[in-house]
Amino acid sequence: LHKEYRRQRQMCIRDSLKIVQTNPIPMARGLGSSSACIIAGLLGANRMLGDVLNTQELLTLATAIEGHPDNVAPALLGGLTSSVFEDGVVYSVKRDVDQSLCFAAIVPDYKLLTEAARAALPKQVAHKDAVYNLSRAALVPAAFCEGRHDLLGIATEDKLHQPYRMPLMPGSREVFALAKQCGAKAVYVSGAGSTVMAVAERAEAERFYAGLRAGLETLEGLDGCEAFTLLELDADNTGATVE
């Protein structure tokens, strides 16, 4: 009996699993680092189990963990996504982002925790402000889909969260002005902040990034922000993969 127990025990013992996480996404900066970790964990576990879950099932599970699909959908699917979570079901549409665009993430040296960013929002908003944002929410994907990059600036204007969160983001107004001066088609707060994201034409990328680098040096130390990190980014239309 003892020999059989030992044999069965040996059969159940598997090599230990070592997990090493390398996450280049700055944390607590409004860039979806938590969602990226959720997707990485789910994809890794799914692969180890033999890919038992399909993409829709993974998206639903990730949304249940995160609480909303806003970040996990693009982290999993890539591209530009529009998503709704209703009665436990995620409805999501993805479209590739035009590669003629490039992106700049301007990351300050301070964090803005999601809890603090949410607390800054008012309990109620004016009806006209809600309408203002709804019209732009419809214009953003339309502008991307039709290649109307000239509309991205007005499409990303906001009255529901940026006016309340930017006072918590030292130097953000100056960064907005700098990015527009450097030729950005659109500038907006990434997620809940504290990162500012700017969109430009790839044909102007060299001048755009050079102008940002030079301008950010002059803003360092302004209003309590000691330094900014400039991340030069491309749109990822592939989404999460397991290698």
Q: Locations of the language-model features?
A:
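Single conserved hydrophobic/aromatic residue that forms the stacking wall/gate
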Residues: 1-13
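Glycine- and acidic-rich phosphate- and metal-coordinating loops
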Residues: 14-27, 57-61
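A short glycine/serine-rich beta->alpha loop
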Residues: 23-32, 62-69, 123-128
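DPxDG-like acidic metal-binding loop motif
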Residues: 33-55, 76-78
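Alpha/beta catalytic cores of group-transfer enzymes, especially the acyltransferase/condensing modules
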Residues: 53-101, 167, 173, 187-189
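Active-site rim beta-loop-alpha module in soluble metabolic enzymes
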Residues: 105-167
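Glycine-rich, charge-dense phosphate/pyrophosphate-binding loop(s)
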Residues: 144-243
